[in-house]
Amino acid sequence: MNSVIIGNGESRSWFNPEIKREEWVDIETWGCNAVYREASPDHIVAMDYAMQQEIYDSGYALKNNCYFANWNVVPSEVAEMTLMGYDIPQEFIHFNNRQKPTEQCVIQGKDPNTLKEKIELTIKKFPNLDIKDLTLKMEKDVGIWITYVEETDQVTPIVGRNGYSTGNAAMSLACESGS
């Protein structure tokens, strides 16, 4: 079987969401991030916490194959205990849009206090990087992301691909699946 990776932003400019799925015979489709808004590929891959939460909130992950990085389901009580005793500004706490918490959740995040240190370390290691671009990308998704989940969702945790971009993770997963 062949695979097609539908990338992000400009890298998906070639993609026409009007193409009917039936026309892609023997082709497995892997979409990145927000492509779910305009199409329904066989699989969606997301590495960023905010995008994962958006996909989950849309209901897409309840009916479609999704692959999310750092996706570890824990009892919901863990979320409450995680927030106890910390003075975390509200702008750094991101809950998904569920009216009522479920019995399980996923807790992810980036500590804004250690972020500057990580940026400086990365710049030392890779001095030729565009510092402005690096900072913009690393500051993305700062805070705690708490997503209450359903037991019947279609999310598969991405394992062993820390540091991959979404497109690279999608290609790796497609190869691993044998397509």
Question: Each PLM stretch: what is its role?
Answer:
Residues 19-178:
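Acidic/Gly/His-enriched mid-domain segments of enzyme catalytic cores or analogous surface patches
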